[in-house]
A protein has these predicted regions:
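Flexible, compositionally biased loop and terminal segments
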Residues: 1-239
Length: 239
């Protein structure tokens, strides 16, 4: 790793390639998802070691319900088990865990486990770890607008005073800084409805590596690439 690296405060990752990775090995897609969950644990620990303050991963999108039912069922089972594993990792690395997305469609037992995990880790002062489950960027914005509209109707919010900051307070990510770096694995170059509001000035890094093979070294490569970017935020800098 290069010396004197500037570490991004917030890294977001689109975990892509689990199914293709498994297929290439002659295994079912569910095997890829299981290995991908293990990779999440490894990257959480490395992010904490590197000094990354916030890590957000895209685990299950609002569109993923359209996958074959057996795959959805397997993902929900994996999610149930992961909640237990995540709590152990959180205790080890002082992680504060927060789940983004519309939880209302999730089974009650999963919602309960999520609530228990968030409550148990809310005061931890290490890595802030966000997991996007049943999450879609458009859906998040719509839900935020509905909540804000209710406040306007009740007279609690003056519509004339609404700003971008006002709406941000109703997003799933309220209180969390926007990502500095977005990593997408397996060579895909699209957002897939992830953090559409928050990625306005985020730097992108596309990794050719499928998520189950994404290692600590790959995370370091992404951060090194980030260090060579010139972030202008819409401004023109003197040459």
């Amino acid at each position: 790793m290069e010396e004197n690296l500037k570490i991004p405060n917030h890294v977001a990752i689109i975990l892509d390639g689990n199914g293709r990775w498994a297929k290439a090995k002659g295994m079912p897609r569910n095997y890829g998802h299981m290995q991908g969950a293990k990779t999440v644990e490894v990257i959480c620990e490395e992010a904490y070691r590197m000094g990354i303050q916030y890590l957000t991963v895209y685990a299950f999108s609002t569109e993923n319900w359209n996958r074959p039912q057996d795959e959805v069922d397997a993902l929900m089972k994996l999610l149930r088990n992961y909640m237990k594993t995540c709590l152990k990792t959180a205790e080890k690395n002082r992680m504060c865990v927060r789940v983004l997305g519309d939880k209302t469609r999730l089974d009650e037992d999963i919602r309960t486990r999520i609530a228990e995990l968030e409550e148990a880790t809310k005061n931890n002062d290490g890595l802030h770890f966000q997991i996007a489950i049943n999450y879609g960027g458009r859906d998040e914005i719509v839900r935020a607008v509905k909540k804000l509209s209710a406040k306007v109707q009740s007279g609690e919010v003056d519509p004339a005073g609404i700003t971008a900051d006002t709406l941000e307070g109703y997003l799933d990510t309220a209180g969390i800084p926007d990502p500095d770096l977005l990593i997408r694995t397996c060579s895909e170059q699209r957002l897939s409805n992830f953090l559409l509001w928050q990625l306005a000035y985020t730097e992108f890094y596309i990794s050719p590596v499928p998520w189950p093979d994404f290692t600590k070294e790959e995370l370091v490569k992404a951060v090194e690439a980030y260090n060579h970017r010139d972030r202008r935020y819409g401004l023109v800098k003197d040459e």
